[in-house]
Structure formats: structure tokens, C-alpha cells
């Protein structure tokens, strides 16, 4: 039986690149790229990606087990499915990326970088996702991009909705609620993420899922992600999810991107600040020549603080809380 992760890590294509089981047909489309189509009728086309950052191993392990169970017949496929391991060379080396962050390159932004394996990979991933959705005759398009965060978080499991000018899918929102996410963050401007690309270019209901902290293979406690794992299994098999057991999600929207625009950029407490740390109005957060930032709202929460990014890139995002009723959902 095809071992999706092992073959991808080997750097060699499988000897057999397509086949079928009792329940589905599968096809290897390239390194870390696999389609699975059920024999039965279906109404959804779903993309699940992991490993855009090579050191984020928990989502890779979760996705690989999902593929293994589908191919073994332990889980019955009910959707048209594309699974992607985003950056195989970085996965092999246990690195976030080798030259540049792929998750800033989508939407054609890779063309502004020095050509590399990662710019070419971003282009390939875009082409495969567009071709997958364009060949679909289904009414529903979904994309979940699985990640883990660099540092700890007051909300260990959270989602990021890409900015879009149309309302978000109510069905996606219900699924995100039922997989026990602690928080949901709404972007308020366009970006170079994979989820933003599939939302903007392919009109997919898309979300980036952050599952805990980045750890090496074999060191993940996957039990803490059991609700999300079950959610993915439920999604691809079209089975019901149990009702949410934990307290309700918290909701945030982005109000400020903190850009590192000078070599002397400083970010307050950056080395030990965890995601969703709260700061009061007036707190000085960043310093750089001619551009300091103080918290403007009564309270703001920081996400993805990283003062070591390259010049011109985002060193963090500031959030404010919002109510569920403020989310644009249809």
C-alpha cells in the first residue's frame, strides 16, 4: 500500500503512480501531491495541506494517518480530495523553510523572490490547486491548511480566516466550531498565505488551522488534537461530528500588522511572549526609527511575534476581540 509520507520523504516517486481500492481511486501527481476520488457520488471538493513549513510535524502526521486509513479502507471517502505536503525538502531537514517562507509567496508573490526550489514549489502548489478545483463539478470547495505555531499560545488550537470581500461559509464556521478550536482570527487585508490564495483565486471556503507548537517527528502528543483529527475524518467521510464539549470559541480580528522596516527594530518582550498575550492601551510595543507603535485600543492581543524576520516583513499582528455576531457569515 502507498505510504504517502515515507515516499515523499524518500524524494523518489512511487513505482506505481495510480491505483484503486474498493472505495476510491488514487493518483500520485508529484512529490507530496496525491488525489483520492471516491467511487460513490460526492458533492464536495476538499484540499487538505500540511508541511508548508517543514518543521511543523503534527499536522503532517495527522494528514498522513488520514491518507493511510483511506487507502486501507478503514475510513470511507465521501469527497473528492487533494492532499498536499507543502515543502518536502524542508520537511526532510526539519526546517521551517530553506530559503524563504512559502506561506508568504502565494497569489503570484513568489515572482518577487529570487528563484529557488521554494518559489517553484509555490507555483506548483498554486497550479495543482487551481487545476483540482477547475476540474470539479461540485458546488462546495474547501481548503484547510494545517500548521503549528513557532511558540506557545494561550489558545493552543486556533484558526485564521483569510480576508475576503464576501461572507464566510456558514457550513465551514459550524465545522470550525465543532472541532473544538479555542479561537478564530479574521484577517482584514490580503496576504500571501496558501489559504488566502485558495479563497481569492479558487473561491474555496478556506482556513489556516494552527495546532499547538512545532516539535520534531515523534514528539507530538497527537491526543491533544483529537477533536481536529476527528473533524478531518468526519469531513472526508461525510459523517456527523459530536457537539462541542469545551467552552465557546473566542473571536478576534486583525487591526495592525507590525512591520520590521529597519535593522534596529525592537519588539517588546519578543523572546518569551506567547501568542494571544494581552497588552493595555498606550503600551509601547515596537520601536524603530520614525515608527514606534503603542497599543491603540483599550486592549490588544499579539499574534506571531517574531522580531527576527527579514526587513519589510511582518513581525507580528495585533488583534482586538469581536463577537460572533460580527463575523460576516452566510
Curated annotation (Swiss-Prot):
Cofactor binding summary note: Binds 1 zinc ion per subunit.
Record: residues binding Zn(2+): 53, 56, 147
Gene Ontology biological-process annotations: arginine catabolic process to glutamate; arginine catabolic process to succinate
Cofactor(s) needed for function: Zn(2+)
Swiss-Prot/TrEMBL catalytic activity: N-succinyl-L-glutamate + H2O = L-glutamate + succinate
Pfam families, A to Z: AstE_AspA_cat, AstE_AspA_hybrid
Function comment: Transforms N(2)-succinylglutamate into succinate and glutamate.
Pathway membership, UniProt: Amino-acid degradation; L-arginine degradation via AST pathway; L-glutamate and succinate from L-arginine: step 5/5
GO molecular function ontology, one term from the record: hydrolase activity, acting on ester bonds
Family: Belongs to the AspA/AstE family. Succinylglutamate desuccinylase subfamily.
Active site: 210
Record organism: Yersinia pseudotuberculosis serotype O:3 (strain YPIII)
EC number: 3.5.1.96
Name used for this protein in its record: Succinylglutamate desuccinylase
CDD domains: M14_ASTE
Keyword annotations of the record: Arginine metabolism, Hydrolase, Metal-binding, Zinc
Amino acid at each position: 500500500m502507498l505510504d504517502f509520507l515515507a515516499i515523499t520523504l524518500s524524494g523518489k516517486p512511487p513505482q506505481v503512480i495510480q491505483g484503486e481500492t474498493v472505495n476510491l481511486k488514487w493518483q500520485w501527481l508529484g512529490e507530496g501531491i496525491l488525489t483520492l476520488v471516491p467511487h460513490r457520488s460526492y458533492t464536495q471538493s476538499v484540499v487538505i495541506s500540511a508541511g508548508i513549513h517543514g518543521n511543523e510535524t503534527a499536522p503532517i502526521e495527522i494528514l498522513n494517518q488520514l491518507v493511510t486509513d483511506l487507502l486501507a479502507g478503514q475510513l470511507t471517502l465521501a469527497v473528492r480530495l487533494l492532499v498536499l505536503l507543502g515543502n518536502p525538502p524542508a520537511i526532510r531537514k526539519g526546517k521551517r523553510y530553506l530559503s524563504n517562507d512559502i506561506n508568504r509567496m502565494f497569489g503570484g508573490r513568489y515572482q518577487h523572490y529570487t528563484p529557488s526550489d521554494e518559489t517553484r514549489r509555490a507555483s506548483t502548489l498554486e497550479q495543482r490547486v487551481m487545476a483540482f478545483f477547475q476540474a470539479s463539478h461540485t458546488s462546495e470547495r474547501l481548503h484547510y491548511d494545517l500548521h503549528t505555531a513557532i511558540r506557545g499560545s494561550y489558545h493552543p488550537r486556533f484558526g485564521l480566516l483569510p480576508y475576503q470581500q464576501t461572507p464566510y461559509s456558514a457550513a465551514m464556521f459550524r465545522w470550525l466550531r465543532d472541532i473544538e478550536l479555542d479561537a478564530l482570527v479574521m484577517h482584514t487585508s490580503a496576504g500571501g498565505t496558501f489559504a488566502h490564495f485558495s479563497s481569492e483565486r479558487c473561491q474555496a471556503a478556506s482556513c489556516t488551522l494552527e495546532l499547538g507548537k512545532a516539535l520534531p517527528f515523534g514528539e507530538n502528543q497527537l491526543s491533544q488534537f483529537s477533536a481536529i483529527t476527528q473533524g478531518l475524518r468526519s469531513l472526508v467521510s461525510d459523517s456527523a461530528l459530536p457537539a462541542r464539549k469545551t467552552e465557546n470559541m473566542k473571536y478576534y480580528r486583525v487591526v495592525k500588522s507590525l512591520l520590521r522596516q529597519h535593522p534596529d527594530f525592537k519588539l517588546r518582550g519578543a523572546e518569551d511572549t506567547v501568542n494571544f498575550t494581552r497588552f493595555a492601551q498606550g503600551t509601547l510595543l515596537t520601536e524603530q526609527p520614525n515608527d514606534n507603535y503603542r497599543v491603540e485600543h483599550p486592549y490588544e492581543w499579539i499574534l506571531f511575534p517574531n522580531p527576527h524576520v527579514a526587513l519589510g516583513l511582518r513581525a507580528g499582528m495585533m488583534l482586538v476581540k469581536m463577537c460572533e455576531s460580527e463575523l460576516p457569515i452566510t
